[in-house]
Every structure is written in C-alpha cells, then in structure tokens.
Amino acid sequence: SMDFKISEKMQATLELVDEFVDKELLPLEQDYLTLDFKDLLPTLAKKREMVKKMELWGPNIPKELGGMGLSMVDHGLFSERLGRTPLGHYVFGCQAPDAGNIEILHLHGNEEQKKKYLKPLARGEIRSCFGMTEVDMPGSNPVMMETTAIKDGDDYIINGHKWYTTGADGSAFCIVMAVTDPDAPPHLRSSMIIVPTDTPGFNLIRNIPVMGHSGSDYASHGEIIFQSCRVPQKNLLGEGGMGFAMAQERLGPGRIHHCMRWLGICNRAFDLLCQRANTRVISPDGKPLASKQIVQEWIADSAAEIQAARLMTLYAAWRIDTVGPKAARDDVGTIKYVVANTMQRVIDRALQVHGGLGMTDDTILAYFYRHERAARIYDGADEVHKSTVARRILEKYK
C-alpha cells in the first residue's frame, strides 16, 4: 500500500527543523559566504549544542550512538528541510562524508574501531573524510585504482594520490580505499583502511579551488598524497577485498540523502524565484516580473519538476526501507540524475529572474550554482547512471 501520510510526531519535528533553519542558520549565510569556514566554527558549535538539546542531532545516526535513528523516508524528509541552507546538514550532524563513514563504521567496524573512531564521530567531536577518487583514474569506475596498501610486518604501507576528498582539511581520520590484492578479480582487489590524518606520509597538499573558491576546513575538497604512509593492519575496516562492495553499500543511501538535500535547495531557489518575480517591478505602471508569461512558465515548470523529483525520491527511499538497497538500485540510480538536473534547472531559472544580482553573493543562488553543478558528476555521473539503468531495462526485452 502507498501511504504518503507523515506521522504527527515527524510533522512536529519537521516544523521545529524549519523554524531552527529560519531563525538560527539563514542569518549566518552571509558570514558563510564571506568568511573562512574555520572562523565560523565557534558559532556553529553553539548551534550544534542547541540541536542536541532539542534532541534533533544525527537524524541518520542510530539511536544507540546518540542519534535519531530515522527510517530512510523520514531522514529524507528531514534532509529536505536542512538542504535549504548549506549549513543545515553540518549543524545537525548528518553531513557528507561523515554520514557515510558513520554508516560503514557502524556496519563493519570492530569494537576497538567503533570506540576510537565511530563514537566521537557520531557525537560530532571529530570529523572524517573518505579517500576514493584518484587523480589519474576514472572516478566513475572505482575498480580502477592505483593507490596500494602493501603488508609489511603488522602494518600496511600506503602509497597513492587521491583528490576531491571532501573536508580532508581538519579531519581526524580518512577512510582510504586502496588495492590490497592486485591479483584478485577486479571487484575484490581493494579494501577500506582507516588512516589517522596525523600519520607521517599522509600529506594534504591543497584544498582544490572549486570555481574559484578553495574553502577551508569542512567546506573544502582536498588533494592528498600518501607517501609510504604506515598504519597498523588492525586499521583494516571490515574484510580485506571488500572495498568495492562497501563503497557501493555506502553510496546507495548516500544518494537518497543527496537527492533530498538537493530538493531542499530546489525549494529554496523556488521560493527566491517566486518572491523576486512578485516584487521586482519592471515597468512604470508597476507591473512585476511575474506578469511576464515566460516567468510564469518557469514557475509552473519548476513547481511540476520539483514535485515529480520529490515523489520519485521518496518512492526510492520507501523502496530501500521495504525491499532493501539492492532491489531498489534502479530507483536510486534514476533519481540521482533526475533530481540533479531538476536542481540545476531550478537554480538557473531563479538566478535568471534575479538578473545581475543572481551572479553576486548577495543571495545564496550563486553559491548553489557554483557548488551544486557538481551534483551531475560526483557519486556517479549522469551518463553512467543512465547507461546502467538503460542496460537493465533492455535486459527485460531480450
């Protein structure tokens, strides 16, 4: 049965989240756009404490680790509300890549790893990063990997070159995907290894400028060179050779979180679009932009596209909750490109309606435009998802 009803408890929670975002986070956006992220950390720490007191910390984090332990659908709804501002997920403790790292540490970590890395991470006392993408290898095909972890006594010695490692700057540890058995079949060659960032040989070379902005701390994307970086073999996460499988397992739920966050961005851009269309007077007789048919068309198209993308995403989340990630993989693959493209169109229309103002940092739109164009690239480019989904559909017709 298909039930779109949100429980009363969840509805009340979402209203609290909306109110918090409006009152506590939106006023910080101008500082976020102009200051270093590091400079905002004391303020954000206070906001995080407020969230914890309200018992809204970690919607994705299991209850036994101090989070809310929400279902995929409820977390999706929560994520949509947080997505309206770039600060939402961070302040509520469910930001990528930590959310995915918490998930795989919870599923695959041993007791020592959980105590040392998972618990402080879940409490928001430390941050982490995830090192998969490599400079010379195709990001969409993680079976192709040059970073190696070679056994030496009781240790691994890691050598390799990673980049686009979100939030590496300021992280306590990195979960690194590296080849541990080059002779194994392609999908069984790599493993996940926990590498504390203060380990000699872990070299964060730079924060890569994204469309001109290099950022700092959590709001950055690092390039890392591993030079004979030695960590104990007990830092292996899960079983050896399961790196690819764990990466896939991490990405499924992650795509739901991303899509719902993007829908939050769509909603925010749509609000700004409509407000601007109604208030921007364009003729002496007082007619606003909203009186133009083309602007009305953008508004109607945006509303329909957001609603369609939202229902598709909630359906995919419901499928993960009911039949599991593997059976829902086509639903998840499809929403990844549908929602990313919807977001790009809605942001673009909102920016256009703002005219020259849309290109400045006086609104949040230019920030969204810069940073969310990548949505069609990371976690599987549009073309890869489309090709995979199409192949599975065609199989049914053979």
What are these regions (language model features)?
Residues 159-205:
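A short core secondary-structure module
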Residues 2-89, 94-95, 108-113, 120-125, ...:
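Alpha-helical interface subdomain recognition
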Residues 121, 136-140, 164-167, 182-184, ...:
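Short Gly/Pro-enriched turn/cap motifs at secondary-structure boundaries
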Residues 228-246:
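Long, acidic (Asp/Glu-rich), low-complexity accessory segments flanking structured domains
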Residues 137-141, 145, 151, 156:
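Hydrophobic, small-residue-rich alpha-helical packing segments that form membrane-like cores
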Residues 144, 198-230:
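Flexible, small-/acidic-enriched active-site or ligand-binding loops
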Residues 102-108, 130-131:
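Flexible, glycine-rich active-site loops centered on histidine and acidic residues
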Residues 124-133, 177:
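A short, Trp-centered hydrophobic/proline-enriched beta-strand micro-motif
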